[in-house]
């Protein structure tokens, strides 16, 4: 089996191998891009981005016509990607003033922006309301009062959703589990705090409560948590209708859809989640006598993960006979913290030796001053020498968005590839960039 076949489910849709035995993405030679733009380098495939956006609308839209897909910007956002999502008809889920600013700088339609977050700052809420965001997803009682106060001062009525915690364990990593009662996010249904917030929202002078939101976590491989959450939330909505006259006009089950990172961790396709979510919304709406609400779906990783590939250059090679061989590259935990933070697993490809036999099992490690700076454990690769190019697929989500300047390193450049052309969409940092905010 060729590398191309072996990696078929994790490489971008346009990936291939050229006559030189080099990995290609979007018709561009990855090794040549490493020379042109230097390394570390992140490559995003435009066709994969657009194709995945279209697939979400296709799979959810054909099962539930009143669907809006909004991209979860925390996975990674810059202006170039925001413009693509705008063109594909998506909305944006943002969680900070910074993400709001990126959206605005890309002329993203603010009425399709949903502002999330468990501790929104006053100035962030003022920006959001001033710029006309479509929805503020209220996370707690303090925020509810604050949003109403700011909306009143601005002389508007702000549409809001309430974020609820349904008390469901999505069985993912504890750091990315968000739907349980013991969570910093949301208003628990079981404790009565969700009802308290709902009553307060309905009586607020400058708020319009139009829906409910849940988010269960990230990297969820089963549709069952979504089914359970919908049943709980729709039951709550029906109860609130009877007790307080609340009408559920919009509902979001969040995102968190898993993607495949390695050959031994297959993930369900989009259709699997769409069928479960849309079917359950229909059945539970009927069961509880609710008018089917508008569906808001919030994929992040599931849109950008596979579209991104990280490119590194091999430097030092350390072979400890009978123990292990280490291949050090010029990036690592500063641009991809996920292996160190979550124990995340990746595959690796030697981009300039794709067709060569896999002769070695090695650890691919970064250049940073931590023993935990390991990008790929037990990677099966051809024999490499300094200067070879390592590609790590499925690097589009939660790598660059969590990147740091650890060890005063420089954040990498990013290119967008399409039909043999590579567009620089973020330049590499310089040493002057590192010091630009220092005050002597």
Predicted regions and their residues:
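A charged N-terminal "starter" segment
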Residues: 1-159, 195, 203-208, 419-440
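Active-site loop/helix belt of alpha/beta enzymes
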Residues: 2-5, 167-316, 381, 407, ...
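Short clusters of hydrophobic/aromatic residues that line enzyme substrate/ligand-binding pockets
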Residues: 15-17, 23, 185, 364, ...
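Charged (often Lys/Glu-rich) extended helix/loop segments that serve as interaction or gating elements
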Residues: 34, 276, 282-285, 290-440
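Hydrophobic face of alpha-helices
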Residues: 50-53, 230, 274, 391
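Structural preference for beta-strand elements that scaffold enzyme active sites
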Residues: 68-70, 89-91, 110-114, 135, ...
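Active-site-proximal loop/turn and secondary-structure-junction residues that shape catalytic pockets
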Residues: 75-77, 98-99, 119-121, 140-142, ...
């Amino acid at each position: 089996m060729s590398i191309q076949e072996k990696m078929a489910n994790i490489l971008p849709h346009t990936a291939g191998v050229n006559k030189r035995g080099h990995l290609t993405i979007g018709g561009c030679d990855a090794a040549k891009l490493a020379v042109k733009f230097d390394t570390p380098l992140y490559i995003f495939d435009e066709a994969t981005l657009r194709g995945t956006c279209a697939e979400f609308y296709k799979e959810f839209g054909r099962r539930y016509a009143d669907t809006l897909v909004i991209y979860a910007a925390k996975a990674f956002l810059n202006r170039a990607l925001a413009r693509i999502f705008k063109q594909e008809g998506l909305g944006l889920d943002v969680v900070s003033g910074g993400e709001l600013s990126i959206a605005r700088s890309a002329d993203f339609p603010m009425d399709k922006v949903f502002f999330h977050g468990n501790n929104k700052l006053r100035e962030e809420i003022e920006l959001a309301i001033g710029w006309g965001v479509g929805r503020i997803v209220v996370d707690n009682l303090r925020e509810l009062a604050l949003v109403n106060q700011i909306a009143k001062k601005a002389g508007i009525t702000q549409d809001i959703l309430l974020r609820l915690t349904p008390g469901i364990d999505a069985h993912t990593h504890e750091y990315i589990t968000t739907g349980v009662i013991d969570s910093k996010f949301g208003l628990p249904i079981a404790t009565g705090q969700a009802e308290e917030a709902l009553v307060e929202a309905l009586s607020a002078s400058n708020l319009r409560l139009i829906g409910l939101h849940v988010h269960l976590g990230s990297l969820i491989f089963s549709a069952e948590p979504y089914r359970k959450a919908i049943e709980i939330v729709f039951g709550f909505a029906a109860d609130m209708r009877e007790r307080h006259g609340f009408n559920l006009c919009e509902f979001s089950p969040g995102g968190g859809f898993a993607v495949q990172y390695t050959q031994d961790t297959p993930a369900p396709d989009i259709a699997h989640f769409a069928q479960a979510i849309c079917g359950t919304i229909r059945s539970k709406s009927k069961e509880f006598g609710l008018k089917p609400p508008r569906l808001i779906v919030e994929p992040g990783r599931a849109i950008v993960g596979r579209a991104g590939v990280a490119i590194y250059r091999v430097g030092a090679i350390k072979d400890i006979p009978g123990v292990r061989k280490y291949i050090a590259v010029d990036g690592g935990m500063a641009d991809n913290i996920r292996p160190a933070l979550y124990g995340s697993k990746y595959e690796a490809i030697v981009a300039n030796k794709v067709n060569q036999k896999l002769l070695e099992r090695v650890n691919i490690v970064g250049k940073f001053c931590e023993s935990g700076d390991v990008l790929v454990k037990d990677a099966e690769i051809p024999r490499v020498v300094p200067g070879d190019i390592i590609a790590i697929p499925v690097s589009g989500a939660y790598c660059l968005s969590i990147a740091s300047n650890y060890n005063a390193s420089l954040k990498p450049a990013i290119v967008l590839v399409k039909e043999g052309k590579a567009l620089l969409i973020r330049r590499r940092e310089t040493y002057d960039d590192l010091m630009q905010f220092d005050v002597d």
